[in-house]
Design a protein with these regions (language model features):
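Active-site beta->alpha loop and helix N-cap motifs at the rims of alpha/beta catalytic domains
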Residues: 1-141, 147
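Catalytic alpha/beta core domains of metabolic enzymes, predominantly
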Residues: 123-124, 135-175
């Protein structure tokens, strides 16, 4: 609940700048924001390796005020990798795992495949899952009917919908 903006991942040259990340978060802690999203699209998650992601997770939790929510992007092409990263996010104190749809084999990503992937991640994630619908990046759009089915899962607690499609969002809310 509230406003939780995405946070960029700062670099110095080609290396992570964790001190800049922590400094940015400490400044944001002084605002009325409810929390932050790290390792999402804006955080360049797809370009980072697992070791870099873990460093970011630890730095973000260290710098985020205890009264702020921390959402960490954990979506991966592999279900097992998404589960592993969701567990790592929980270990580092994330409040939610933000799970984008796998897209590499988008021709195979029908409603059944997406349901299986997202349900398995939610089943095994120790923290609540937020679906991330970002068709501009994945070329896959979570349809309202599928979102409604997934919303029945006790560990799926919301959606970040980046479609910009108000009619679709209205359908999701209605369902």
């Amino acid at each position: 609940k509230g406003v939780l903006p995405p946070v960029v991942t700062p670099f110095r040259g080609e290396e992570l700048d964790l001190e800049a990340l922590k400094s940015n978060l400490r400044v944001l802690n002084q605002t009325g924001l409810s929390g932050y999203v790290v390792l999402g699209s804006t955080g360049e998650s797809v370009y980072l390796d697992d070791g870099e992601k873990e460093l970011i997770l630890a730095a973000a939790r260290e710098a985020t005020a205890s009264d702020k929510q921390l959402i960490m992007g954990t979506g991966q092409e592999s279900t097992r990798a998404a589960i592993r990263l969701s567990r790592l996010a929980a270990k580092h104190g994330a409040n939610f795992a933000l799970v984008v749809t796998p897209a590499y084999f988008k021709g195979q990503m029908n409603a059944e495949a997406l349901m299986t992937h997202l349900t398995r991640v939610a089943d095994d994630s120790p923290i609540p899952v937020l679906l991330y619908n970002a068709p501009q990046f994945t070329a896959l759009n979570l349809q309202p009917e599928l979102v409604a089915q997934l919303a029945q899962h006790p560990n799926i607690q919301g959606i970040k919908d980046s479609t910009g499609d108000i009619a679709q969002l209205t359908d999701i809310i209605r369902l």
